[in-house]
């Protein structure tokens, strides 16, 4: 199933016929996809649907068995890695470090592709730690942080990495709210939303359908490695579609203030 194309957004990323098979299991089954600048695209689906596999193929962590990827109309393989790092940032679900860095040093790692001075890197990382709300953790040892704190420090790192991306910016988030409390879930997604409003293409793997409906411009439901639905939250989150994919009956109502769909299970 091919993606829908909006006429007033440029294509940031285009994937054609992506096929991925690991251990004899098909994880992606000839997926075609166009990701637009200036939008948040949420990848949804049950466990094992192919969401994280798709994100890892798109960001180059996993090489597909077949298919092609273009980033800003240029084949992904033609991008020098250091140049691509300025324009595409990835926040994985789990980030591990084997050294006892201070939290601000982790955030400063994002400046490595930017060719700026150490002082500029420190200032940039400090600014993004404030934005994410982890500036009070700057001098804490990274291994002593909670899972949610680590995730937010890495978000500051990714924002630092993309600081010089200009108009060509892709942000990929793999379950960015999984370790966060309610307030930090919304704060993280508000930052992603602000970036998209500035022109970035944002791709989020997320399980919470209500958060996806609230913040994403476009929802893509995957199941068994295929795109099952693709459109606006109201187009995608119908009771029938949700029950068919997740195997659970739901009701869908409109949020009383903001009119996005709310799922009641």
Curated annotation (Swiss-Prot):
Top-level lineage group: Bacteria
Keywords, sorted A to Z: ATP-binding, Cell inner membrane, Cell membrane, Membrane, Nucleotide-binding, Translocase, Transport
Recorded GO CC terms: plasma membrane
Gene Ontology MF terms in the entry: ATP binding; ATP hydrolysis activity
Annotated residues for binding of ATP: 45-52
Membrane topology designation: Peripheral membrane protein
This enzyme's EC code(s): 7.6.2.-
InterPro entries: AAA+_ATPase (IPR003593), ABC_transporter-like_ATP-bd (IPR003439), P-loop_NTPase (IPR027417)
Main location: membrane
CDD domains in alphabetical order: ABC_Iron-Siderophores_B12_Hemin
Limits of the ABC transporter domain: 13-249
Subcellular location: Cell inner membrane
Entry's family note: Belongs to the ABC transporter superfamily. Heme (hemin) importer (TC 3.A.1.14.5) family.
Subunit structure: The complex is composed of two ATP-binding proteins (HmuV), two transmembrane proteins (HmuU) and a solute-binding protein (HmuT).
Reported function: Part of the ABC transporter complex HmuTUV involved in hemin import. Responsible for energy coupling to the transport system.
The protein's name in its UniProt record: Hemin import ATP-binding protein HmuV
The species this protein was found in: Photobacterium damselae subsp. damselae
Gene: hmuV
């Amino acid at each position: 199933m091919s993606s829908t194309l909006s006429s007033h957004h440029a294509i940031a990323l285009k994937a054609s016929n992506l096929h991925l098979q690991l251990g004899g299991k098909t994880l992606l089954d000839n997926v075609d996809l166009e990701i637009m600048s200036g939008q948040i695209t949420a990848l949804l689906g049950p466990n094992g649907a192919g969401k994280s596999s798709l994100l890892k193929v798109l960001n180059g962590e996993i090489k597909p068995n077949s298919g092609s990827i273009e980033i800003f109309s240029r084949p992904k393989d033609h991008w020098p890695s250091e140049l691509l790092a300025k324009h595409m940032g990835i926040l994985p679900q789990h980030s591990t470090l084997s050294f006892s860095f201070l939290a601000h040093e982790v955030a400063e790692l994002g400046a490595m592709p930017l060719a700026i001075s150490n002082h500029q890197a420190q200032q940039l990382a400090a600014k993004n730690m404030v934005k994410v709300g982890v500036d009070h953790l700057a001098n804490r040892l990274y291994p002593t942080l909670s899972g949610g704190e680590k995730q937010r420090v890495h978000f500051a790192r990714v924002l630092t990495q993309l600081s010089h991306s200009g108009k060509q910016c892709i942000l990929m988030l793999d379950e960015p709210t999984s370790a966060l409390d309610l307030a930090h879930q919304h704060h993280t997604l508000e930052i992603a939303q602000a970036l998209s409003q500035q022109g970035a293409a944002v791709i989020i793997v997320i399980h919470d359908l209500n958060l996806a409906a609230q913040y994403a411009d476009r929802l893509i439901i995957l199941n068994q490695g295929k795109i099952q639905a693709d459109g606006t939250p109201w187009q995608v989150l119908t009771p029938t579609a949700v029950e068919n994919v997740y195997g659970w009956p739901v009701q869908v109502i409109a949020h009383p203030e903001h009119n996005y769909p709310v799922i009641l299970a």
